[in-house]
């Protein structure tokens, strides 16, 4: 038995059976048992979800399955889904650094084979919650690169990340037009 204070948001409204998980559990005690089964009790602050099958009702896309296969806890997107159209903040921290670490250790050829060939702006703007974790190839012009130092000791220890770069990229629109503002009928 794993006791935790939070579960993936999708699990709150459905029965969960056979879903792969990962958790850092502290052993509490040996619980009840018999000759066929022994119960172990663990406490954990968080349970990570590593789904293996897409499920539109649970917002699990093929892209999230690919990330989960690399060890990325896709439940970390739960708080991010509510923060679209806002700056990156502390609430995005764990998901952000796990994404950097996961993509950083992945095989480049495997990533390229799963990537969408170009960034399609329409779905990113219209329905960003369905795009989280989508792997895309970004073609554009780098206008500025800023080195961001990471001072968090736990990020250094867990992921080996002491810096990253923030690159401002201009993406060519080609024949596409982007309309900002309200659409009148």
Spans of model-derived segments:
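OB-fold and OB-like single-stranded nucleic-acid-recognition modules
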Residues: 1-185
């Amino acid at each position: 038995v794993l006791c935790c204070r939070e579960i993936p948001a999708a699990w709150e409204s459905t029965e969960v059976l056979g879903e792969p998980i990962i958790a850092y559990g502290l052993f509490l005690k040996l619980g009840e048992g018999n000759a066929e089964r022994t119960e172990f009790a663990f406490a954990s602050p968080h349970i990570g979800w590593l789904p293996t099958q897409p499920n539109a009702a649970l917002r699990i896309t093929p892209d999230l399955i690919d990330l989960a296969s690399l060890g990325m806890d896709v439940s970390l997107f739960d708080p991010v889904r509510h923060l679209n159209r806002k700056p990156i903040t502390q609430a995005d921290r764990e998901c952000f650094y796990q994404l950097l670490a996961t993509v950083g250790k992945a095989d480049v050829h495997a990533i390229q084979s799963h990537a969408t060939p170009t960034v399609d702006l329409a779905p990113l703007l219209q329905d960003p919650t369905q795009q989280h974790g989508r792997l895309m190839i970004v073609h554009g012009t780098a206008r500025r690169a800023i080195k961001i130092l990471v001072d968090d000791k736990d990020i250094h220890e867990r992921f080996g990340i002491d810096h990253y770069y923030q690159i401002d990229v201009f993406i060519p629109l080609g024949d596409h037009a982007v309309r900002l503002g309200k659409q009148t009928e």
